[in-house]
């Protein structure tokens, strides 16, 4: 896949965007890095419930950004490795691990090259967090990488934005994008979701929509078994301006509007 010239160009464009935004995210209010360093947990309760006890288990976090979720798993006793294609993000993750005194391994690599970058190591858990798959053009190749990274009996845990929510317009519940699109959507937007007013220069990104059927088929074709699947009617950020913020920090539709799935999660195991 990465031998395709277009894919390589898209990845490099996305990498430049993420590289530029790392210091904005590390120092901004959205991620609250001081609070995290002081002990704040960044994982969602449903993630902890569905993953279960990680004490003593090996866990690799793909597309880990600057490592908050990775290190949250480490604080729970997992032996963690974080991987991301952004060198500045990995530098920030390593600095955070050193600052809080947590043993963690962070590696710079494209996710498609993860097995080689990690020396063909295998893990008990492959964790993929919210907002990951839209950055990948080929989920079938991604699922094969996941399967290579899992030891027999290990499992993938994926938590992500629901593709249904991704096809809707930014200001309404009107369908604006194709659910079954095969080409990436090109965006050109200054700032970042963490700070809309931030001054940035690398503002172009490419995102790929992936239908649930595409994700499920890729995971099954890689030889994994889907053990559980859940959909959620809330988001972790104001996806639309009319969403209501609840006391638990989630964002939900007003009571007079129909609900739509905004997130999903699944767990898929590799046969022992």
Question: Where are the regions that the model predicts?
Answer:
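Acceptor-substrate binding/catalytic loop of class I
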Residues: 160-174, 199-214
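Conserved alpha-helix/loop element of class I SAM-dependent methyltransferases that forms part
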Residues: 29-58
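A short glycine-rich, Lys/Arg-flanked "PGG" loop and its adjoining helix->strand segment in the class I
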Residues: 140-155
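Class I SAM-dependent methyltransferase SAM/SAH-binding core
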Residues: 57-116
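A short SAM/SAH-binding and catalytic strip from SAM-dependent methyltransferases
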Residues: 124-140
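A short acidic, Gly/Pro-enriched loop at the edge of an enzyme's catalytic core
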Residues: 116-126
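Conserved class I S-adenosyl-L-methionine
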Residues: 155-193
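Short alpha-helix
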Residues: 205-229
